[in-house]
Amino acid sequence: MAEEDHTFETADAGAALTFPMQCSALRKNGHVVIKNRPCKIVDMSTSKTGKHGHAKVHLVAIDIFTGKKLEDLSPSTHNMEVPNVSRQEFQLLDIDDGYLSLMTADGDTKDDVKVPEGELGDKLQSEFDEGKDLIVTIISAMGEEAAISYKEAPKGSA
């Protein structure tokens, strides 16, 4: 039998997209899944136990990719999904056709992240056009990725 080379092109080690957490354990500035969207909790309040039921947790959260506000009301004993959110920094190589061309830490290129919309994307484009070396922060959760910030690379790092 011939030896076969197996290559696996995954960035995560098969980690689940989300994990369960009891409502009462969620915290402000933490993450939660509401209506199948990864969100950052901006406000939460708890109502007292009623005559017929459990204490309720009222969550107000912002979608980490779209910025839309979402709300949820759940019994404090229920489990909610929490997204696995990761942040990585990449060096910006090029901006082409609405996508960022980024270099990973091991020298590979990553070309599947869109230029962010609005002011962030405009500033990123103009500073790149000025010839600045930029480091872009990419946030990823539940199979989606987006550039959320950038900074100028320290001189002499490239």
UniProtKB/Swiss-Prot annotation:
Domain of life per record: Eukaryota
Coiled-coil boundaries: none
GO MF, one example: ribosome binding
Any one GO CC term of the record: cytoplasm
SUPFAM superfamilies in alphabetical order: Nucleic acid-binding proteins, Translation proteins SH3-like domain
Major localisation: cytoplasm
Hypusine: residues carrying this PTM: K51
Organism: Candida albicans (strain SC5314 / ATCC MYA-2876) (Yeast)
InterPro entries linked: IF5A-like, IF5A-like_N, NA-bd_OB-fold, Rib_uL2_dom2, Trans_elong_IF5A_hypusine_site, Transl_elong_IF5A_C, Translation_prot_SH3-like_sf
Compartmental location: Cytoplasm
Highest classification ranks of the organism: Eukaryota, Fungi, Dikarya, Ascomycota, Saccharomycotina
Family classification: Belongs to the eIF-5A family.
Presence of the UniProt keyword Protein biosynthesis in the record: yes
Pfam families for this protein: eIF-5a (PF01287), IF5A-like_N (PF21485)
SMART domains: eIF-5a
Function: Translation factor that promotes translation elongation and termination, particularly upon ribosome stalling at specific amino acid sequence contexts. Binds between the exit (E) and peptidyl (P) site of the ribosome and promotes rescue of stalled ribosome: specifically required for efficient translation of polyproline-containing peptides as well as other motifs that stall the ribosome. Acts as a ribosome quality control (RQC) cofactor by joining the RQC complex to facilitate peptidyl transfer during CAT tailing step.
Keyword terms: Cytoplasm, Elongation factor, Hypusine, Protein biosynthesis, RNA-binding
Protein name: Eukaryotic translation initiation factor 5A
